[in-house]
């Protein structure tokens, strides 16, 4: 049985992840962390009844991870929190599932160094949906055949999302750029802005949109649109739990959802 711990346990994603852990036959929740609601039962926020696991203060992360013998820590919090907590978990020998977006390249380098130094396993992905990762694969293939077309990415999310553009949109851009040998990114357009051979990336924020991503390949006489729409955050939580179940059987290293899904 895999011992799982969850950061941000009272939040929207953390509570869904806990709900999905309770449905797993291979994993059990042993620790839940947040900055508030300390001492309350984690099941209260996941709406799954009393689990007997109290919310621990994230300040006690190292102590609780060691005490509970956690095998894996799932983190869908914020970049400023992940950059602190991921190295602590790695130092405890705990594997990591990181779904936090908005992490800078410098922050990611620090996290990856801690993972390598401590010989743990980690999956780092901006999106744990199976469909989105298939979407990336389709976009990669399309880019190879539509390299001369203008390429635009449009993403839309709820009005509470802090980072823009989304990690998923940036990953889509990276996938295209890798397929085409490198592309410049342009974020939105304003004023006199002639189009070059760049990838345009645009963010929309409004209401309760879970997550929409569209990649457009636009030619002079036709347009190809590849679209993914998320209807529920459950897809991210299910994917994270799937990744956590998978990672514990792997060699130490840093993995993506491509590895988890065999894409």
Curated annotation (Swiss-Prot):
Predominant subcellular localization, coarse grouping: cytoplasm
UniProt keyword annotations, A-Z: Amino-acid biosynthesis, Cytoplasm, Diaminopimelate biosynthesis, Lysine biosynthesis, NAD, NADP, Oxidoreductase
Binding site for (S)-2,3,4,5-tetrahydrodipicolinate: 158, 167-168
GO molecular function: 4-hydroxy-tetrahydrodipicolinate reductase; NAD binding; NADP binding; oxidoreductase activity, acting on CH or CH2 groups, NAD or NADP as acceptor
Pathway, per record: Amino-acid biosynthesis; L-lysine biosynthesis via DAP pathway; (S)-tetrahydrodipicolinate from L-aspartate: step 4/4
GO BP annotation list: diaminopimelate biosynthetic process; lysine biosynthetic process via diaminopimelate
PANTHER family for the chain: 4-HYDROXY-TETRAHYDRODIPICOLINATE REDUCTASE 1, CHLOROPLASTIC-RELATED, DIHYDRODIPICOLINATE REDUCTASE
Name under which the protein is recorded: 4-hydroxy-tetrahydrodipicolinate reductase
Organism: Methanosarcina mazei (strain ATCC BAA-159 / DSM 3647 / Goe1 / Go1 / JCM 11833 / OCM 88) (Methanosarcina frisia)
């Amino acid at each position: 049985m895999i011992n799982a711990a969850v950061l941000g346990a009272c939040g929207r994603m953390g509570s869904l992840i806990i709900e999905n852990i309770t449905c797993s036959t291979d994993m059990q929740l042993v620790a839940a962390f947040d900055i508030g609601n300390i001492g309350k039962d984690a099941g209260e926020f996941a709406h799954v009844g009393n689990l007997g696991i109290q919310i621990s203060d994230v300040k006690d992360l190292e102590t609780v991870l060691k005490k509970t013998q956690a095998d894996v820590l799932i983190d869908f919090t914020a970049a400023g929190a992940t950059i602190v907590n991921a190295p602590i978990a790695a130092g405890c020998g705990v594997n990591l599932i990181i779904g936090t977006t908005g992490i800078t390249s410098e922050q990611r380098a620090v996290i990856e160094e801690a993972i390598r130094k401590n010989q743990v396993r980690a999956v780092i992905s901006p999106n744990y949906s199976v469909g989105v990762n298939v979407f990336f694969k389709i976009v990669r293939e399309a880019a190879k055949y539509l390299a001369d077309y203008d390429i635009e990415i449009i993403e839309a999310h709820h009005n509470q999302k802090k980072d823009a553009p989304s990690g998923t949109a940036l990953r889509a851009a990276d996938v295209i750029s890798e397929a085409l040998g490198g592309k410049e990114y342009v974020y939105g357009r304003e004023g006199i802005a002639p189009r070059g051979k760049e990838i345009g990336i645009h963010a929309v924020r409004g209401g309760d949109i879970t997550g929409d991503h569209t990649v457009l390949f636009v030619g002079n006489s036709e347009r190809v649109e590849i679209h993914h729409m998320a209807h529920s955050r459950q897809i991210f939580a299910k994917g994270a739990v799937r990744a956590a179940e998978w990672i514990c059987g792997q060699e130490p290293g840093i993995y993506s959802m491509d590895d988890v899904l065999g894409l």
